Each structure stands twice: as structure tokens, then as C-alpha cells.
Amino acid sequence: MEKKIAVTAGTFDLLHPGHFNTLNFAKKHADELVVIIARDETVKKIKGRSPVIPEEQRKIMIETLKPVDRAVLGSLNDKLEPILEIRPDVIILGPDQTTYQINELKSQLAEHFLYPEVLKVEEYVKCPFHSSYDILKEIVRRWCCKELKV
């Protein structure tokens, strides 16, 4: 019997509870979890800024987490490339993905005769520092203005 493979993807720059929630959710839906780490160049294009932590370090951090079986760097040319190579049974998307994005992904994969189940983590983890942005804001609040007199 073949292992059921799940894939999820993200920047995973400053780890927070939302990341762990997504990874645990993904692992519950498969025997093997592969995480695609967004490339520094891709993050800069999409978010307008480079990640704090370089891609190779983010990959190492993610692949050492308990639910993760393997981490790979995303493609610089085609976001579907690693998915087409892995050929997962399940793709897990974060709570910030829209129905349009999900349907678009399914359509693009179908063009390559790949029909994985696409699941979405439905709820955000509600706690302090549930996003990388919140962590950065708190670091600035605590350190930059007081310690550096900025």
C-alpha cells in the first residue's frame, strides 16, 4: 500500500502557532508531509520585502519539526513545479487562501492530470503573535524605540 502524501507551502519566516496548526492539520491527512518553502526571491516579489531568515535556514528549521517528513525549496520559475514532482494526494492550504485560489489551483493541476484533494485550514489560531507580522511589530515595540532610540 502506497503512502498518502500531503503537501503544504509557505514562507515560514518567523515561526508562530499558525504555522504549527497548519503543519499538524496537514499531517493528520496523510502518512507523509512534504513542505514547500517559498524562495527568498519569490517572497520579495509577492510581499515586497525579503524574508528575515534565508530560505536554506527556513528549510532546515521546517524539516526538523515533528510533523514534517521532508522540506523542499519552491521553484523560482513555476509555483506548480514542486507539486508536479511530488504528486501529492492532498494539498493543504492555509486559512488565508480564498475559494478562487483553491479553484484556480485545482484547474491548473487538472491541466497536468493531477487531481489531489485540496483542503483548507479553516480557522486562524487566536492567540498573541499568531502571525509573523505581529511578532515583528512586538519586536519593534519592545526593542527599536526603547533600546535604539528610533
From Swiss-Prot:
UniProt GO MF annotations: ATP binding; FMN adenylyltransferase activity
Q: What does this protein do?
A: Catalyzes the transfer of the AMP portion of ATP to flavin mononucleotide (FMN) to produce flavin adenine dinucleotide (FAD) coenzyme.
UniProt KW Methyltransferase keyword: no
Q: What cofactor does its activity depend on?
A: a divalent metal cation
Q: Which residues bind ATP?
A: 11-12, 16-19, 96, 124
Quote the InterPro entries the UniProt record gives.
Archaeal_FAD_synthase (IPR050385), Cyt_trans-like (IPR004821), FAD_synth_RibL (IPR024902), Rossmann-like_a/b/a_fold (IPR014729)
Top-level lineage group: Archaea
Q: What is its EC number?
A: 2.7.7.2
Mind telling me what this protein is named? FAD synthase
Question: Could you tell me the Gene Ontology terms of the biological process aspect for this record?
Answer: FAD biosynthetic process; FMN metabolic process
Entries under Pfam families matching the protein: CTP_transf_like
Q: In which pathway does it act?
A: Cofactor biosynthesis; FAD biosynthesis; FAD from FMN: step 1/1
Record's keyword terms, sorted: ATP-binding, FAD, Flavoprotein, FMN, Nucleotide-binding, Nucleotidyltransferase, Transferase
Listed under subunit, the entry gives:
Homodimer.
Catalysed reaction equations from the record:
FMN + ATP + H(+) = FAD + diphosphate
Q: Which organism is it from?
A: Methanococcus maripaludis (strain C6 / ATCC BAA-1332)
The record's comment on protein family reads: Belongs to the archaeal FAD synthase family.
